[in-house]
Design a protein with these regions (language model features):
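Charged linear interaction tracts used for macromolecular binding and regulation
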Residues: 71-232
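Long, polar/Ser/Thr-enriched low-complexity segments
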Residues: 1-116
Length: 232
């Protein structure tokens, strides 16, 4: 609020600011709108950050292990490291570019994944799920036979994933038990009564992320392979 001091005023009244400078009465106007409104780029950056933050919670089973050593070195949480490493993993249309996502970081020697196969039989009632097996080159190059191989299967349709029980590098294969609906989503059919049938034609692609961890806790960089629905 402006105050009267003799023949002059000082203070703020509306968008006007009154003051005295070297004995003279002065005033200036405040802008009625923000000088630099949020640009489209800033809005996109905020949106991308929110998406990566959500993805870090969906993939926490993987990055809590795969980025643990890296987070210790950086003196930060694995969530923060995950967001930092994946802040630019986006397609031109603003979707997360899943093939570029990083869930582990390190210098442990990687392996080559040679195949990924699914048991074609539908899980029976009461079973835990359908076995999904990934084989990899078990020959040891720069790593050790005792290194652990971790496999994380991400299902974007439900924004969830599953971490398989780790196996030694020397084993050459790892099996994950996946929910039936990930592989063969149900669809209603008319056969006199409403029933559900399971078909791979409605399936969504799976994304496989793997890494190795040494006995000292160090990890490898992320190994990624897609599993398109056409392969099921």
């Amino acid at each position: 609020m402006a105050r009267k001091q003799g023949d002059s005023e000082s203070g703020k009244l509306g968008n006007k600011i009154y003051y005295t400078w070297h004995g003279r009465q002065c005033e200036r106007s405040m802008p009625t709108s923000v000088a630099n409104p949020q640009t489209e780029a800033q809005q996109a950056h905020r949106s991308n950050f929110a998406m990566v933050s959500k993805l870090s919670s969906y993939m926490k089973e993987a990055h809590l292990i795969g980025l643990h050593w890296h987070a210790i070195r950086e003196r930060n949480s694995t969530y923060a490291i995950f967001r930092q490493l994946n802040k630019d993993c986006f397609t031109p249309d603003g979707e997360i570019n899943l093939p570029r996502v990083i869930v582990s970081r390190g210098s442990v020697e990687q392996v080559e994944i040679t195949s990924a196969t699914i048991d074609n039989g539908v899980a029976s009632t009461g079973s835990a799920g359908i076995p999904f097996t990934v084989t990899f080159d078990s020959r040891v190059y720069g790593g050790k036979a005792t290194d652990e191989f971790f496999l994380f299967v991400y299902y974007p349709a439900l924004c969830t994933g599953r971490l398989a029980t780790p196996v030694p590098r020397s084993s050459g294969l790892v099996t994950a038990i996946l929910p039936e609906e990930w592989l063969y989503p149900a669809e209603p059919t008319q056969t006199g009564t409403n029933t559900l049938t399971h078909s791979s034609k409605n399936a969504f692609p799976l994304h496989l992320y793997a890494f190795l961890r040494s006995t000292r806790g160090r990890t490898s960089d992320t190994i990624y392979i897609p599993l398109p629905k056409e392969t099921r």
